[in-house]
Amino acid sequence: MSFVFPSWSTAFSPAFHEDAKAMLEGALNKGDKPPVIQGKIEVVELHMGEQPPTLTLLEIGDLSIDRFRGILRLGYQGDAWLEVRCRVQANPLSHNPHLTFSTLPLSTPLLASQPLLVPMTLRLSKLHLRAILILVVSASKGITLVFKNDPLQNVDVSSTFDSVEVIRGYLQQEIEGQLREMFREHLPGIIHRLSQKWFSGSGVGGKVEMPYRDMSPVPSYAPINEEVEEEENEENHGTSPGNEESFPPRHIGPGGITLPLNNSVSQLAALSYSAHTLSPYARGHEHIAVRSFPYLGKSGAGTGSSGRASLASSSVGEGDIKAKRKRIFRIGKSKEADEKSEA
């Protein structure tokens, strides 16, 4: 089973970007940084890109109303990018403070023993991920994510010092090491803290909230009642089309997945039961055309003594069924008496 993420480019609001940038900044500044980086690492820009990741469900370990546990395969090779800003120490003498000046050849340009801090901008793009992960979703505890292998396959690192080949290779190696540690140690905690903002309440009655997605209010449709529907149709028979209430069309993503309505379960139940009827009238559903047919059960022995006709002999698609000749039955008179009276 695979999953498709519809509308990936518009699924994240500015509030999500601000929270994600703050958590990424805290994760990058946590722990020991390379000695060449001085000061605080600032996350300047975060863009989720246009191409969504792919998830393939491999195994379901636990499935209930408020809990899911499974093993999935994650794949991503999109156009997301991250830009950070920091200060690096450009003075080579500061890396080895025990080095004496007598061991260095003196030349015209002298090197300073004080550290020289140079601002640098890093841009991470062309991220390629492939991993097997264990996903646990709980309505009360949030989302727990564990990678079973190293997800990072490749990343493109560009910086202010791309013209210097030695510095470029050094930064590529250091950033890849920091990203591998972040995916292993810090990213599961970031996703868990973000998921706790999405879920509110506890247990089965908990309500799931998505504060980061900008969604317009969607009208809810109540279950269809035939009597109320007929009365409304009779009252609105003479109204003009301009007075009817119109709703905007539903947004359909690139994967063909529509956002569910608030009363979608009732609509699916009504649609399922609409075929189990002998009524010639079809229930009205948005974007769905339904035709009611009589129930075709097992064929019986024809017309029984009780006068019930078998519907199994009728077939759909053979053309219109011609109406039979109307028969008149009179109680208390025989057929011969009727012919004599008519003569």
UniProtKB/Swiss-Prot annotation:
Ranges where the SMP-LTD domain occurs: 1-196
UniProt record, GO biological process: mitochondrial genome maintenance; mitochondrion organization; mitochondrion-endoplasmic reticulum membrane tethering; phospholipid transport
Disordered as annotated region, ranges: 227-255, 300-325
Keyword Isomerase: no
Cross-referenced PROSITE patterns: SMP
Location (main, coarse): mitochondrion
Localization annotation: Mitochondrion outer membrane
Domain of life: Eukaryota
GO molecular function, one term: lipid binding
GO cellular component, one term: ERMES complex
HAMAP family: Mdm34
Role noted for this protein: Component of the ERMES/MDM complex, which serves as a molecular tether to connect the endoplasmic reticulum (ER) and mitochondria. Components of this complex are involved in the control of mitochondrial shape and protein biogenesis, and function in nonvesicular lipid trafficking between the ER and mitochondria. MDM34 is required for the interaction of the ER-resident membrane protein MMM1 and the outer mitochondrial membrane-resident beta-barrel protein MDM10.
Protein family (similarity comment): Belongs to the MDM34 family.
Domain observations: Lacks alpha-helical transmembrane segments, suggesting that it resides in the membrane via beta-sheet conformations similar to those predicted for other outer membrane proteins and porin. The SMP-LTD domain is a barrel-like domain that can bind various types of glycerophospholipids in its interior and mediate their transfer between two adjacent bilayers.
Protein name as catalogued: Mitochondrial distribution and morphology protein 34
Organism annotation: Cryptococcus neoformans var. neoformans serotype D (strain JEC21 / ATCC MYA-565) (Filobasidiella neoformans)
Upper taxonomic lineage: Eukaryota, Fungi, Dikarya, Basidiomycota, Agaricomycotina
